[in-house]
Amino acid sequence: MSNDNKDLFSVLNHAQSRIDRKENTQYTSAHSEIVVPAVPLSSPHHHKEDSTYNASSIRILEGLEPVRLRPGMYIGGTDSKALHHLFSEIIDNAMDEAVAGYADLIDITLDSNNYLTVTDNGRGIPIENHPQIPDKSTLEVIMTHLHSGGKFDGKAYQTSGGLHGVGISVVNALSDDMEVEVARERKLYRQRFSRGIPQSGLEELGDVYNRRGTRVCFHPDSQIFGENTAFDPEKIYKIARSKAYLFNGVKIRWNCDPAALKDAKNIPEKDVFYFPDGLKDYLSLSLKNKHLVTAEIFSGKTQQLSGHGSVEWAIAWHNGDAYIQSYCNTIPTEEGGTHETGLRQTLLRGLKAYAELIGNKRASIITSDDVMASTVVMLSVFIKDPQFVGQTKDRLATTEAQRIVENAIRDPFDHWLANSPHEATKLLNWVIERAEERLKRRQDREINRKTAVRKLRLPGKLADCSQNSAAGAELFIVEGDSAGGSAKQARNRTNQAILPLRGKILNVASAAREKMSSSQTIADLILALGCGTRSKYREEDLRYERIIIMTDADVDGAHIASLLITFFFQEIPDLIRAGHLYLAVPPLYRISQGGKVAYARDDSHKDELLKTEFTGKGKIEIGRFKGLGEMRAEQLKETTMNPKKRTLLRVSIDTFEMQETKETVQNLMGTKPEERFRFIQESSTFANNLDI
């Protein structure tokens, strides 16, 4: 099964593009983040005699060829998130120089032609011939060889996030034009590359006396990311600003061509990021005008002994949504890791110790989940040789990081509580209230899940699964009884439930609350989920691990998916934050030739399959599915519901773009058609194909 992440902004924009343009245009958009799987939805079936397997079938990939062939293995895909990951790789190298104490200035320049330049005043990439490959400069080795760099032996860098040979070489492979300048030992050098291949030798440009460091200028390859792909100035700006918060010893200067800012809101052409109080400055700005449980933000920074690294944190408790933004060596760890585990355990133990000190026995019931409820956390660690899960470094796996964080925060947290007894008691009572609410909810729930089902009187159209546990359970939301019938036959009855919807769900972005409350379709959906809405959402009451929107692969299906996503975003956003909401990817076409069958999700995929898979003799038959209900149960199972073969797109929310996402949802789904039309004109490449 393939699970690709898609932020909610991209999902809605992509779906709206399908609705508001002519149906025969292809799936391409500047903001669309549909990830094309490496294989068709259903791989073509061949007769055994059609295939050969011998020595000539084995291919050895050389140099950076694996990166171009499977970019998803290195940057997580070819969508907008992956595109901006290229910038992260380059600025991470510059930040490593700053953290190591060799640089204090980074310049970032975004041109209107989609060239991005990052310059630092560090030591500069070495340029002398490499001892292991004597006929090449070290710069060329770093740029063209995976797993080469100065961060493996721990001598050049005590802590680092990027690895020159993994990060910058991958960016080089995925750029159609890249130029690297190195100012080192009073000499200026330059080398050019294209798609990972040197286009020139190492050139010595002359003497420089007032400059040192590395300048990297690159242009993403349209063959990888698409013709209309462009950097988002707002995303680049926010990434750069966050790096400055993470290390208060660096100044980052931002420059952007005005032509590149035409669609960006409130992003200046020039800016300077420098924050002497680091994460505390960041959190104070984020929580401006918010009511906090304690008057002060708990923040600090600890340098560990024996060169093991450092920890910086800023923590506040408030009455809003909880989120944790953590980093390791300036790398954002979106999926958490061992450093977050250390933080959670330390805060729990500290509060329990304080409760014992003041004789509050009620605190015995609190857990780390109670402590972290409605907590806003910024956590940054710098450690030697960090171990991450996956190439994109979304989760920290270093075991020692937990101990480092615990040792760093334990004493400061104890002192913070002891020095402000009034605030500490207020916080403790607040956490105890969260724990008591949790226990009351548990007592109110029926022990047996099936009893709870009967008690709730779940919708009659719901075909529930047989297992009692939510772990591994899936709810498919489908449109209409016809599709529901096929899905019920195709499902695994043990863990897959089907909920057919009657017609299009209400657009909650434009409907009054009274109308939403009277909608039977919405009431059925809320009952089936079992987790409540808005502030009453309870993760532990959610009856399924995955909520999968499965609609037709046409315009109407996209519209229904947009309405459902809007409902989840406005009414149950925590369900999206927890990673429970997915989009199924059903096929639009069935292609057959002789004994070979394949399924295509859209027109461009169909054309690709016709060129690559159906090149033999014989009549090619192409059938277009009008809807899921037209598919046989075995076809639906094979292409869309079988975990081993299907593709799912996970919907996500970027915490730091929450306000922008709210505005986008309102513009696309709200009551003002002129705002929707304006948004499409400004943000979509399909404006010329509008069919209104």
Curated annotation (Swiss-Prot):
Chain sites annotated for binding Mg(2+) 1: E479, D552
Keyword entries, A-Z: Antibiotic resistance, ATP-binding, DNA-binding, Isomerase, Magnesium, Metal-binding, Nucleotide-binding, Topoisomerase
Positions bound to ATP: Y53, N93, D120, G162, L163, H164, G165, V166, G167, I168, K393
Cofactor: Mg(2+); Mn(2+); Ca(2+)
Residues in Toprim domain copies: 473-587
Binding sites annotated in the UniProt record for Mg(2+) 2: D552, D554
InterPro entries the UniProt entry points to: DNA_gyrase_B_C, HATPase_C_sf, Ribosomal_Su5_D2-typ_SF, Ribsml_uS5_D2-typ_fold_subgr, Topo_IIA, Topo_IIA-like_dom_sf, Topo_IIA_B, Topo_IIA_B_C
Protein name stated in the entry: DNA topoisomerase 4 subunit B
